[in-house]
Amino acid sequence: MFVDSHCHLNYKGLVENQAHILARARDSGVSAMLNISTREREWDDVIGLAEQEKDVWASVGIHPHEADQHVGMDCAKLVAKSAHPRVIAIGETGLDYYYDKSDRAQQCSGFREHIKASRETGLPIIIHTRD
């Protein structure tokens, strides 16, 4: 039995072939998948897939590269969305200074909110870190 603990089944190039990708994973012995969100606009799609597929679970979070696009993201939004029974983690979140895609202070602020949400819900946090 294998578990894919970090996949992005809703990414362009994958979502168009989602049924085939899921079938291949299952045929290869993957019995569960955690579909990770990286932007708020993905949350409903990630959760929707988890509702449709019994072996797919969801996370809610904002990737550090997207921090500038989510100014004001707070713990309350994360907690509210993570109340869905198919959501089993908070993230992907963290700090990524390598590509300099988002302001460092905004990344730190968002990361803190994710940590608060993880503590409040008791859900594990998915941390992305680079440089």
Where on the chain are the PLM-derived regions?
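Mid-domain alpha/beta scaffold segments of enzyme catalytic cores
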Residues: 1-131
